[in-house]
A protein has these predicted regions:
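Hydrophobic alpha-helical transmembrane segments
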Residues: 25-29, 58-59, 96-104, 152, ...
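Helix-boundary and loop/linker segments of multi-pass membrane transporters
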Residues: 16-18, 87-92, 139-149, 180-182
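Hydrophobic core segments of transmembrane alpha-helices in multi-pass, intramembrane catalytic enzymes
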Residues: 63-68, 157, 209-217
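N-terminal, membrane-interfacial amphipathic/helix-forming hydrophobic leader that caps
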Residues: 1-119, 242-255
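Membrane-interface interhelical connector segments
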Residues: 121-147
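Transmembrane alpha-helical segments in integral membrane proteins
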Residues: 70-76, 154-180
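Membrane-interface helix/loop boundary segments of multi-pass membrane proteins
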Residues: 165-190, 219-229
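Functionally important transmembrane alpha-helices
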Residues: 40-41, 192, 196-197, 204-255
Length: 255
């Protein structure tokens, strides 16, 4: 009798997404394109910034950051108006340690997939990593250093704003506008497939790197159904590879 009561309670609390599902899908697709703008524009601007004056570089950085903040406002407001999850859970020490565990798991998956990619294809980086690395390599060319305002903007996009927007969209909005509250497997798999497809995967191994990353991020989100957890894991993951390059740039810039 107790089991039946619990089952009925779960069914009654299994909330449906708000709005029309077809419209929600179209909005989701549009937002995929929208969230590419901040990091895309900043990476395009980076190599050209060596030719810009200091004032132009600062103005461009402010413009890119302003556009990014506007997009965050739009995407966040849409998410908050459609979510069926509690958005005000605190981040305790236990949660931080668990998220670091998810980060380590994601890094292990990435290393194993990269090793397989090297063995079977001879490539040691994915197309997405290569594109970002080529941009970041500019930061260590001491004769043609980009202005610090543009560099700080790129780092901000890669480490903070990019992960923030991607988690809002690929975990939060995708799950909570297209699936019922307690659905797991379908949003887990499909969101990870879509996430991987957005990272320029060119072979099965590079696809696996981002698919498994998407899986780990979804598990981080699903643990408490709190988007802040997957955001933290994603931001830490991007920062691990980006911040050392930024520190090297700062050392060259202020020498």
């Amino acid at each position: 009798m107790v089991i039946m009561d619990d089952l009925k309670q779960n069914q009654s609390s299994n909330e449906k997404p708000k709005g029309n599902k077809i419209i929600n899908i179209l909005i989701f697709i549009g937002m995929i394109l929208l969230i590419q703008i901040p990091i895309g524009v900043s990476l395009i601007a980076l190599p050209f910034s060596v030719k810009f004056s200091q004032l132009t570089s600062i103005a461009l950085s402010m413009l890119i950051t302003g556009i990014a903040l506007l997009i965050i406002w739009l995407v966040r407001n849409y998410y908050l108006s459609h979510t069926y999850e509690r958005q005000y859970q605190s981040m305790r020490g236990k949660d931080i340690f668990i998220n670091i565990g998810f980060l380590i798991l994601a890094m292990v998956f990435s290393i194993l997939s990269s090793l397989l990619m090297v063995i079977f294809t001879g490539n040691d980086t994915t197309a997405n990593e290569k594109e970002i690395n080529e941009s970041l390599d500019l930061l260590l060319q001491k004769d043609h250093l980009p202005h610090i305002s543009i560099v700080a903007t790129v780092v901000l996009m890669i480490c903070i704003i990019g992960p923030y927007l991607e988690e809002l969209l690929f975990r939060g909005i995708f799950k909570e506008t297209l699936f019922m509250k307690y659905r797991f497997w379908l949003p887990f798999i499909i969101s990870s497939i879509i996430f991987s497809s957005q990272h320029l995967s060119t072979n099965i191994f590079s696809y696996a790197i981002y698919f498994l990353m998407g899986c780990v991020l979804y598990l981080a989100y699903n643990r408490r159904r709190n988007i802040k957890d997957s955001m933290m894991v994603h931001m830490l993951n991007n920062s691990v590879s980006t911040l050392p390059v930024f520190v090297g740039y700062l050392w060259l810039y202020f020498r």
